[in-house]
Amino acid sequence: MKIKILFATLLTLFLFTTGYAQTLDKAKLDLFFERLAEKKKAMGSLTIAKDDKVVYTRAIGYAQVDATAKKPLTAASRFRIASITKTFTAVMILQLVEEGKLKLTDTLDKFFPQVPNARKITIRQILSHRSGIPNVRRDQATWKPGAPVTKDEMLALIVKGAPEFEPDTKNSYSNSGYFLLGLILEKLTGKSYDQALEERINSKIGLKDTYIATGHIDVNKGEALTYINTGSDWKQSFETHPSIGFQLISTPGDMAKFIQSLFDLKLISQDSVNQMKTMRDDEGLGMVTFTFAGKTFYGNTGGGDNYGSWLAYQPEEKLVVAYTTNAKVHPVKDIVTGVIDIYYGKPFEIPAFQTIAVSPEVLDQYVGVYSNPEAPKKWTITRDGGTLFVQPGSENAAALEATAQDKFQLFGGRLVFEFDAAKNQMILKRGGRSIVFTKEK
């Protein structure tokens, strides 16, 4: 009998210590985020939740930086979460399916017959990015990044675009498809997206800080402006008007509560959750998967205007990691990977972020506009003080890190720029590939 009791005790202890991180190393998490803040590699907010309880929060950096003051970020700071909005949209679409107001097999011509291939495109295909609807990008539109655009103008751009492929023959990410789903949601509910969100999600699970972005960022409402690293400080990034699509503002705390409630079946049925989780070409219905620390997580990511967001849920352990940033410098994925490795007690070395100084005289040799006839964008190189900046096309400029007198990197080394001033060339290296750009005169 004593042997059986001892065995049961040891088994219980084993199960406990191999599940939730035995002792969460909060000191190491603190050190990681302190290093990110000190080296100006990120500004943002993190929430880790386990079994419906928050076990760690941390915010670094600022919601607003101006000449007179800096407003620190807090756990309550609100961020644009970009494509994580799609997960909310997918949940509400699946609610309509469960209510019998919509079918995943319904075709788009039921709502927007003017869209090319509308009779062939199903709701399921739009949810899983298999519709072939072209992704309307900012540089295709006629408005300036900060100017508003109406829903009719967005719809006209989508209608004008040629299909990328026949429906369900491949996968291609489409913000435009989810814009149409937002319009369908409004048509079927007779309510605005924001009203539907409040009734169908927020009020059901107690979200207080999640809503549609309708105008420019308002720091007086706790919203965080977006910034780029100038090398010596933070410079406000340009801000795309949110009217180009349905875009949510939220906090890591609300995001964590949302995905936990989703998997707790407080929003949709198990069958609907299973459909969201079923991957085809790495896409589910408003959901993707990640592998961290050898475990499968479900969730989504978002990015735009130098905002970044990551929401990851491990269902067997009921673990949520929600991270938002208003200043992407160090890759968001690398930050989330570090957080999860630390959580599970995996080996993780906090980066030193060592760079070298290059004189302004040397940097000026690299300044200019670089192009390649086979590349879709030109790359503009500028200097501000002792920092070199790169701007692809009309996108935001980003500060480069010098690793040698003629070599610089971006996104933790994912992009490498090598300059040959004598030849007026810039070599862009990514993933084992190299492209030579020539400076324009």
Which residues does each predicted region cover?
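Short, well-ordered beta-strand elements
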Residues: 299-300, 310-327
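Short, surface-exposed loop or secondary-structure junction motifs
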Residues: 119-311
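Short, small/polar residue-rich loop motifs at catalytic or cofactor-binding pockets
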Residues: 40-43, 305-307, 375
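Bacterial Sec-dependent N-terminal signal peptides
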Residues: 1-24
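Active-site SXXK
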Residues: 33, 46, 52, 60, ...
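Short, glycine/proline-biased beta-turn/loop segments that scaffold the active-site neighborhood
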Residues: 104-118, 203-205
